[in-house]
Amino acid sequence: VPRVQKERKMPDFVHLHIHSEFSLLDGANRIKDLPVRAKELGMKAMAITDHGVMYGVIDFYKACKKEGIKPIIGCEVYVASRTRFDKEPQDKKYYHLILLAKNNKGYQNLSKLVSLGFTEGYYYKPRIDLEILEKYHEGIICLSGCLAGSVSQAILNGNIEEAENVAKWHKNVFGEDYYLEIQNNGVKEQVMVNQKIIQIARRLDIPIVATNDAH
């Protein structure tokens, strides 16, 4: 009698990379509509990850609770290419990184990071740097970000070694709370980046998470 192989169930999809109207000049999603749509799609949770700010998290929390959706509080932070104190023309370049609070301590640390982005790192955008990311990482889940993330940017520049070094640094800081992010957004470059990220994830034993950078 042939053995029947048990089908492996995929985890339920949850949006972990979403922008609202508080991602100014960028996000078109209305906070009040997000959990309603998530409920229609049978999702049990969703995150908010506006660019560099947390203005909408209270409204988002209340809207999710109203619809029975678990709210995940996060932010897509801007990471300075050097330090948060460097503010010269070359420092207009920055990277994107997704941070999600997994508990109250994580929410406190995320709030601290976002605040420091404004009070210490502001240069065109509210920027943090690796120093304070390491200092205030407790209770935070970190995703590698979109095509503007430091891992993806290194891949796009043809520097796989640099991409791996970036991933290693974040893994050392966040441990099992660091994930490499892949997306299916119709962008040609994303397909190549996804392939390289999967390879890096296997080599470095880092888990992968699928997101879709919803705006």
Model-predicted segments: where are they?
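Short polybasic linear motifs
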Residues: 1
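Phosphodiester-processing cores and adjacent nucleic acid-binding clamps
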Residues: 4-215
